[in-house]
Amino acid sequence: MIINLQELIALLPFLILLLTVVIVILSISYNRNHFFIAFLTIISLIVSLCSLYFLIAIVPIDITSLFHITKRSILYISMIIISSIATCVFAYPWLLKYAFNKEEFYLLTLISTLGAIFLTISNHMASLFISVELMSLPIFGLIAYSNSQKYSLEASFKYLVLSGVSSSFLLLGISWIYAISGNLSLLCLNQIFSDLSNSEKMMVLFGIIMVLMSFFFKLSMVPFHLWTADIYQGTPASVLSFFSVSGKIAIFSILLYFFSYFSVFDNKVIFLILSLISFFSILFGNLMAIFQTNIKRFFGYSSISQIGYLLIILLVSKDEYFFSVQTGGIFLLNYLCTNIVYFGVINLFSNSCDYDIDSIHLYKGLFWVQPLLASIVTIVLLSLGGIPITLGFFGKFCIFSIIIKNHLWTIGASFLIGTILGLYGYLRLIVNMYLNPSEQSFINDIKKSNFWLCSPSGILIFISGIMLLILGIYPNPLINLINSVQ
């Protein structure tokens, strides 16, 4: 296999991260230095993000038959890297509490980031499976990094077992597809499917459904959602900002790429499965979030409904594909920014108070002590609810347009009911922050966070929150950016 110069340039962002992984391993082996490894990891992620600019002129390009890089995949890779940067920034002050094994956190984050990136550009079932495993395996360690807390160990063990079951479904589906079609290329699958007999089509369809079931588990969709709340509760907040975003962006991007060749509209079985899962995920996620008192569990159920909205984008005809990609980019950017803010805030206060601030009632009266931070959290919650002048409203408006254009009336009903239920849940959190503080709130312990905006975590939270407002009021730059990557 010979890789030419152009392909080498296309691999530059990934080679930078691979080189960083090697340096981090050597540094851990010979001379541990937490600050150096954290700084090196963040800088390498930023350099890798900037190097994506050089790919714009040479894409689309194939790197062997395993990977296919497009402008659209560059957009999703950018989001994944930004999520990784946020995770490393949030994790540094949190890891200072640990006497040992701080540096391995950044190694696991880099490896998982590489897996998510490779999944985004996968063009073959073999690279897809390896990328999913490369992305998932380090997450087991990240979830259990607070090994002194039983909830973290329990969450890691649950995710390990259930992820193994998910991987077995993925491998079964891939094997079934290959046994019938003799080809594992995502690009050729639709053509192969159309050339098969009806009985062979049913068997390939079974394999595709197995693959989708594995992805739905990773996306925590109903009915594969039962692990979500427990694992969100047990996972450290700094890890959640990565766990909740990068994998879901990568998996959604590969689903969007797959269905660009294998139209959902052309197969009633796939269309029905996606419709039902989207319908119940929206309703169940928003309904269960209302009854939560733990803020991590709340956002766990909220993520189920948010990805349920996102699945609607896949239920379009080929004529609407361009608009669905545009909508997906807007919605995922909103999802990225909101996750960075609210998990960043939880991490910020947990570090300041030396205990987990994960109960909703602990945030009562936050506005009267930290008005700017409470205002940013308010913007985030309103954006998740789809209130005007936020980016979330624009994303939901585009999804509602897809529902109308494609006559998805049943999904539309769940969309409206889910939005109302979601608004109730988000407004409950907002009102809680503006009430008078109670004795149970952590207001007395918050003094150390008075200068939160001067910290790297605070700057990241502030920028992400303000972006939701600016792009909600003036979304044209974002629309032009997404249109340019089509």
UniProtKB/Swiss-Prot annotation:
Which keywords has UniProt assigned to this entry?
Cell membrane, Membrane, NAD, Quinone, Translocase, Transmembrane, Transmembrane helix, Transport, Ubiquinone
Reaction(s) catalyzed by this protein? a quinone + NADH + 5 H(+)(in) = a quinol + NAD(+) + 4 H(+)(out)
EC number(s) in its UniProt entry?
Answer: 7.1.1.-
Q: Which cysteines form disulfides?
A: none
Q: Where in the cell is it found?
A: Cell membrane
| Main EC class the enzyme belongs to | translocase
Question: What topology does it adopt in the membrane?
Answer: Multi-pass membrane protein
Q: Does the keyword Lyase apply?
A: no
- Single Gene Ontology BP annotation: ATP synthesis coupled electron transport
Keyword Cell membrane in annotation? yes
Q: Name one GO cellular component term.
A: plasma membrane
Q: Name one Pfam family in it.
A: Proton_antipo_M
Which InterPro entries does this UniProt record tie to the protein?
NADH-Q_OxRdtase_suN/2, ND/Mrp_TM
**Transmembrane stretches, by residue range?**
8-28, 36-56, 74-94, 104-124, 125-145, 160-180, 204-224, 239-259, 270-290, 298-318, 329-349, 374-394, 407-427, 459-479
Record-level Gene Ontology MF annotations:
NADH dehydrogenase (ubiquinone) activity; NADH:ubiquinone reductase (non-electrogenic) activity; quinone binding
Q: Which family does it belong to?
A: Belongs to the complex I subunit 2 family.
Please explain the role this protein plays, according to its UniProt record: NDH-1 shuttles electrons from NADH, via FMN and iron-sulfur (Fe-S) centers, to quinones in the respiratory chain. The immediate electron acceptor for the enzyme in this species is believed to be ubiquinone. Couples the redox reaction to proton translocation (for every two electrons transferred, four hydrogen ions are translocated across the cytoplasmic membrane), and thus conserves the redox energy in a proton gradient.
Q: How does it assemble?
A: NDH-1 is composed of 13 different subunits. Subunits NuoA, H, J, K, L, M, N constitute the membrane sector of the complex.
Q: What is this protein's name? A: NADH-quinone oxidoreductase subunit N
Give the gene symbol: nuoN
